[in-house]
Amino acid sequence: MRKQADLVFQIVSLLTLVVALVALGVLVVDIFNDGASRLSWRFLTNIASRRAEDAGVYHALMGSIWVILLTAALALPIGVAAAIYLEEYGTRSRVARFIELNIANLAAVPSIIYGLLGLGVFVRLLQMGQSVMAGAATLALLALPVVILSTREALRTVPSSIREGSYALGATKWQTIWNQVLPMALPGVLTGLILALSRAIGETAPLITIGALTYIPFAPDSVWSKFTVLPIQIFNWVSRPQAEFKVNAAAAILVLLALLLSMNAIAIVVRDRQQRQGRA
């Protein structure tokens, strides 16, 4: 009876996986068929235009790269520092438990709430305006819970014998964390960062809330420039009544997918290299 139940569970799980992969494959193939004809160097290097055949994604692609790099620069050090405190220093304090509870809740907060927070704090209170910095700071808030939770999980995977051996050699707690624990946890930290950035780069609602532009004829050249990103540009083209702009939107989706896959590929390479160095 148990073997039959296990077999049924395996079959149901396999069918669920196949259905999900087929649905995803159909969507990707459909988008590729619609947008592949528009993909070209000209499409990648042209800026926005009211004529579909002349429009490109350079401004949105550069905006996405600016925003995601700044988001990583903000979320990584803050998230790792918070995780180190919660996991290594504040494990028994009430403050740490309160922070843990709120971080777990923040991971499930709708992204539009982060947009409203960014509008109130970064755009108005700190007077950053509708800039790349305001967008990156807002997305960093969105990414922080994921970075913190994944970093804590990575720190927990480091054997306690590593810490004890370091202490036995006379190292301080911080020296142990910096020289032993963090290098071993780095692959997991990078995985969590890429997951957080992959979510952030596809967000539209928070950036529209803080005032990111749906039409902009130039690429940002500093952190204080106005900007748009690929998801907003895709939304703009999909909203147009002309069929040619739908083709542009499909091509832009392919560019966004390529950007996401590139980020994940870089993370995998770095993670594997760190794991090999850790084994050595």
Language-model features, listed with the residues they occupy:
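Generic hydrophobic transmembrane alpha-helix motif, especially the helices
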Residues: 104-141
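Transmembrane alpha-helical segments of polytopic membrane transport and secretion proteins
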Residues: 1-17, 267-280
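C-terminal transmembrane helix and the adjacent membrane-cytosol boundary/short C-terminal tail
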Residues: 152, 156, 160, 167, ...
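Transmembrane alpha-helix signature in integral membrane proteins
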Residues: 55-85, 193
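Amphipathic cytosolic juxtamembrane alpha-helices at the membrane-cytosol interface
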Residues: 78, 91-95, 100, 163-191
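Transmembrane alpha-helices
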Residues: 72, 150-151, 173-211
